[in-house]
Amino acid sequence: MNFQHTDDRRMLADSLNRFIAEQYTFESRDKTARSPEGFSRDMWRRFCELGIVGALFDEASGGFGGDGFDIAIVFEALGRGLVVEPFLDALIVGRALSCAGNEGQRPIVTQMIEGSAIAAFAHDEPGSHYELARVTTRATRHGGGWVLNGVKGVVQQGEHADVLLVSARTSHDDYDEAGISLFAVPRDAEGVTVRGYRKIDGGRVAEISLQDVALDADALVGREGEGFETLAQAVGYGLVALAAEAVGAMDVAKEYTLDYLRTRKQFGVAIGTFQALQHRMADVLLDIEQARSAAINAAAAVGGAGIERERALSAAKYSIGRIGARVAEESIQLHGGIGMTWELPLSHYAKRLVMIDHQLGDEDHHLARYIELGKASLCGDVSP
């Protein structure tokens, strides 16, 4: 398989990296991350005008990319810049609506690409422990529509989204893949309560309570009780995005550390000349390349289906979780005490790498999932 980027992708990467380097400095990013909104609407609009959100979707959805490698190119650059704007949720929600949305819902994808709408993925629940099928929020029929009740946790930009993609159970038990439905819910709908709070790595998330939220019948995304497959497909693209973002962040942490080792002196020489530190940096470099390979493999597999797709995605998420923690720890230790300070950008990259591990399943979850998928493959079960 040829993993070389096309000219169009290289141009996209160059444009985005240049834009972030010139317009998204660490100082401006830090100010934005600590703002009441946790992101910049103006910067979000500028990213959209540059076509970055459009690169996440295919032409049928109003974009011009949508391949796993298009997504990886974008998110690797976003990881290098520690971008806090809501790209991940735009990707996941947009994928779900493009796949299963009705004619009234698909225009939301176009609005996100244009920058006129912000969407949030409201799926995780307290106690779900990363299990995608663990949904306790309930949707019951009422008249010609639906009524939703439940609680969603750690919803990215949940305070400021225009629309929430909410998973709710319409039948079956709490852990069943069958019986899960998806709904497009206006954030300002009656019965929706949002409690926002700040993340340790910058930006904001929210806990969203749904109490007797009445929805029209056309709020249902796809078919009743058949939302899990749409959910799994969309989250798969999110895993590719997180893997690529982590690689971008790791690259910058490595660059900061190498620069410090070249300039920090002890006993009259740069500490980078000490053999023990050289060996540690060599291990970091090898680890990052392993993470990059796993991310590339996930980007290549995400457009497929079945167990092999899911194994590649879980392998990538496990790898970037384990390696991201190692890169963060080694980079801080090689910097000494200064590596922990707020003023040094490195500490923010370290926090982001730790948080990436906990999004859409941590390394322990995905290692266990990878093993279970392998067992299923050996038993001849071809479904994920």
Question: Model-predicted segments: where are they?
Answer:
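N-terminal glycine-rich flavin-associated loop
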Residues: 83-103
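A generic, well-ordered mixed alpha/beta core segment in the N-terminal half of proteins
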Residues: 99-118
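Alpha-helical interface subdomain recognition
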Residues: 1-85, 100, 115-116, 141-146, ...
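Cytochrome P450 C-terminal beta-domain/meander region
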Residues: 131-149
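A short, Trp-centered hydrophobic/proline-enriched beta-strand micro-motif
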Residues: 115-124, 166
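A short core secondary-structure module
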Residues: 149-193
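Short beta-strand-to-turn element immediately C-terminal to the catalytic PLP-Schiff-base lysine
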Residues: 98-101, 140, 166-169, 184-186, ...
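Flexible, small-/acidic-enriched active-site or ligand-binding loops
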Residues: 130, 134-137, 185-216, 223
